[in-house]
């Protein structure tokens, strides 16, 4: 486990332990932690597996709240907030500035784009596009993450343009390549 400067670890964190993945047979693997992250009480972060990346990676300036579990081979970007008792199964990828509502569960191999937001108790089983919100039971698209974008300093013009792109991509019933052409 390699840990950068400025990280804070609170009571009962489990950092860099063997993964419980059944394919793991004790081979060399690692956990890479960037700078200035906060790991609150009872969070757990596993190393990677040789079958995939061979490492788990956490970027810089993340807040990992109590009870959060980050499984093997996850890649976490920068500036994310993982709220209490959220769980990331193996091979999950988070972009930058993602917020996970409390008790969010993310199925293995899912990707959450930068500036996305999950509501309380979301059960993520598919990728979540950048800049969007998902919420509810079952979890569904809930629109653009406008509040998060405003808090991160996006201009009104940038948010308006993202709203237009979101509408074209998710509300007009176009095929992906058609939506991309229309947005361009």
Residue ranges and their predicted role:
Residues 1-140:
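Structural signal for interior beta-strand "rungs" in well-ordered beta-sheet cores
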Residues 6, 12, 23-24, 28-30, ...:
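Terminal amphipathic alpha-helical/low-complexity segments used for targeting or macromolecular assembly
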């Amino acid at each position: 486990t390699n840990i950068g400067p400025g990280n804070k670890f609170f009571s009962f964190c489990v950092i860099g332990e063997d993964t419980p993945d059944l394919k793991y047979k004790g081979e060399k693997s690692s956990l890479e932690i960037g700078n200035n992250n906060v790991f609150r009480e009872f969070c757990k972060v596993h190393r990677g597996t040789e079958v995939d990346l061979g490492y788990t990676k956490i970027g810089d300036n993340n807040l990992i709240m109590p009870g959060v579990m980050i499984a093997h081979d996850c890649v976490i970007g920068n500036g994310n907030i993982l709220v209490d008792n959220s769980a990331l199964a193996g091979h999950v990828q988070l972009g930058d500035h993602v917020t996970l509502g409390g008790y969010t569960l993310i199925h293995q191999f899912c990707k959450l784009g930068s500036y996305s937001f999950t509501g309380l108790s979301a059960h993520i089983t598919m990728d979540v596009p950048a800049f969007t919100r998902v919420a509810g039971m079952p979890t569904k698209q809930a629109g653009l993450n406008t509040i998060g974008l405003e808090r991160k300093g996006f201009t009104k013009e940038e948010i308006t343009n993202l709203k237009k792109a979101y509408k074209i991509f998710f509300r007009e019933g176009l095929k992906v390549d058609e939506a991309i052409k229309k947005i361009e």
